[in-house]
Curated annotation (Swiss-Prot):
This is NADH-quinone oxidoreductase subunit N. Keywords: Cell inner membrane, Cell membrane, Membrane, NAD, Quinone, Translocase, Transmembrane, Transmembrane helix, Transport, Ubiquinone. One of its GO terms (biological process) is ATP synthesis coupled electron transport. InterPro entries: NADH-Q_OxRdtase_suN/2, ND/Mrp_TM. It is an enzyme of class 7 (translocase). The keyword Ribosomal protein does not apply. Its main location: membrane. One of its GO terms (cellular component) is plasma membrane. It comes from Erythrobacter litoralis (strain HTCC2594). NDH-1 shuttles electrons from NADH, via FMN and iron-sulfur (Fe-S) centers, to quinones in the respiratory chain. The immediate electron acceptor for the enzyme in this species is believed to be ubiquinone. Couples the redox reaction to proton translocation (for every two electrons transferred, four hydrogen ions are translocated across the cytoplasmic membrane), and thus conserves the redox energy in a proton gradient.
């Protein structure tokens, strides 16, 4: 009976695994001409998985009924919230890929299969209740991501991005494994509940180093300073649909996993990791903003923007309260929409031959040549900057509010001050598009799926998005409470 209950809880993961294997077989037998069909089937699988996990989120599932395989897997509402964000992000990335790869005659059915496998790994990551489960999910995601980064085999930038991601990712995995071995050595267990119980009271120096190494390994996955060095090169070199994927779904999974690890197995030793998270948050905000200022390549700029936004997300985690975690999830959801919209807009910047345009010089005067695209980008950039009344302001507001409520007034003040620096390079987007002389380089026609996603993202981050804040706040409060109950 217990096995049946456990299998029911992991049904979305089972469906994704079976679907991925079936799609691989279809690809092997039929060949590249099935690329679009495989993409549609992969997106349908992810949509079905999202429907399966939705009831756990809306009901606020938590406690023993959400535990599978003796604590190895947790299907609570916190995991469900993260999974829905991950699945929807992956679906968006599948929608935008064909138009990009078709121009290069590189649309292969392996792309949606790899996205599906990476998403399966992320799904396992956010539901991990054991260090071993954590590592299995993380590596399944990472191995698929390495291949995706170098998907354009004949493109030197893509190959370089894949190689850098692989080498630095392997280093991060080694650091994480070493930390896990120290935690196991000093607690005698890999189970989150067991580790939490063993770390009650005074923490040994060895266990403290284990916590530090585990968090360092996870910091690489979320691209937090000082483990951010791979992000600009990989984001610039990888195909833009892959970069979009990296900036959204894996970011959600890694942040959710970091929160679960910090508050579940290490929840009794908040003081051991809180200062680390505060440092990473402030360093990411400042270095992300400063690094972006001198960039001329738009993809590299958005990579630094991603690092900057991770800092704001980590402020919510640093608060280590239900309100802080809820604010973190709220910001994460808003960030996914902003990032997806921004990279879709970059995909739409191309000349008459379909060649991508990726520099500020290419978008000079865009408001006169492509006004709809320019206005959508304006909404997204101002929202990323946190300028009211756009929805990005609300994300920053709830994060800073949670920090103040947790008596971290100085952290909130420093975060607000640093966000002013970050606003500079977002405003540069607007200045170039609306006030520079037009160059009229953007001439290519855009795919319908691109326009649909871009307009949807622009509407969500507009003041109309505030209509969703009550509903979103209820979901994030439920998800955050479930993690604290599990802890």
């Amino acid at each position: 009976m217990e096995l049946n209950a456990s299998l029911t809880l992991i049904l979305p993961e089972i469906v994704m695994a079976i679907s991925a294997m079936a799609l691989i077989l279809i690809t092997a037998y039929v060949g590249d001409k099935t690329a679009r069909l495989v993409s549609i089937l992969a997106a349908a699988t992810l949509g079905a998985a999202a429907v399966m996990v939705a009831p756990a989120l809306t009901s606020g599932a938590s406690g023993p009924d959400t535990v599978a395989f003796g604590g190895q897997f947790l299907a609570d509402s916190f995991a469900s919230f993260a999974k829905i964000l991950i699945y929807l992000s992956a679906i968006g990335c599948l929608m935008i890929a064909p138009a990009f790869f078709d121009r290069l005659k590189a649309m292969r059915p392996e792309y949606p299969v790899l996205v599906l496998l990476a998403t399966l790994g992320m799904s396992i990551m956010v539901s991990a209740g054991d260090l071993i489960t954590l590592y299995i999910g993380l590596e399944l995601n990472s191995l698929a991501a390495y291949v995706l980064a170098s998907f354009l085999r004949n493109d030197t930038r893509s190959a370089e991005a894949g190689l850098k991601y692989f080498v630095l990712g392997a280093l991060a995995s080694g650091i994480l494994l070493y930390g896990m071995s120290l935690v196991y050595g000093f607690t005698g267990t890999t189970d989150f509940e067991g580790v939490r119980g063993a770390l009650t009271g005074d923490m040994s120096t060895g266990a403290l180093f284990g916590v530090i190494f585990v968090l360092a390994g996870l910091a690489f996955k979320i691209a937090a300073v000082p483990f951010h060095m791979w992000t600009p090169d990989v984001y610039e070199g990888a195909p833009t649909p892959v970069t979009t994927f990296f900036a959204t779904a894996p970011k959600v999974a890694a942040v959710a996993l970091t929160a679960r690890v910090a508050l579940s197995p290490f929840g009794e030793q908040t003081e051991a990791w809180q200062q680390i998270v505060i440092f990473a948050a402030l360093a990411s905000i400042v270095l992300g903003a400063l690094g972006a200022i001198g960039q001329t390549n738009l993809k590299r700029l958005l990579a630094y923007s991603s690092i900057n936004n991770v800092g704001f997300i980590l402020i919510g985690l640093a608060a280590s309260t239900v309100a802080g975690l809820s604010a973190m999830l709220t910001y994460l959801a808003i960030y996914v929409v902003m990032a997806l919209g921004s990279f879709v807009a970059l995909l739409m910047l191309k000349d008459e031959d379909g060649t991508p345009l990726e520099t500020f010089d290419d978008i000079a005067g865009l408001s006169t040549t492509r006004p709809a695209l320019a206005w959508c980008l304006l909404f997204l950039m101002f929202s990323l900057a946190g300028i009211p009344p756009l929805l990005g302001f609300w994300g920053k507001f709830v994060v800073f509010q949670a920090a103040v409520q947790a008596d971290m007034v100085l952290l909130a003040a420093l975060g607000i001050a640093a966000s002013v620096i970050g606003a500079f390079y977002y405003i540069k987007f607007v200045k170039v598009m609306f006030f520079d002389d037009a160059v009229d380089r953007v001439k290519g026609t855009s795919d319908t799926a691109h326009w649909v996603l871009l307009i949807l993202a622009a509407v969500v981050v507009s003041p109309l998005g505030y209509l969703l804040t009550g509903w979103l706040g209820g979901l994030t409060d439920s998800a955050a409470s479930a993690l604290f109950i599990a802890s």
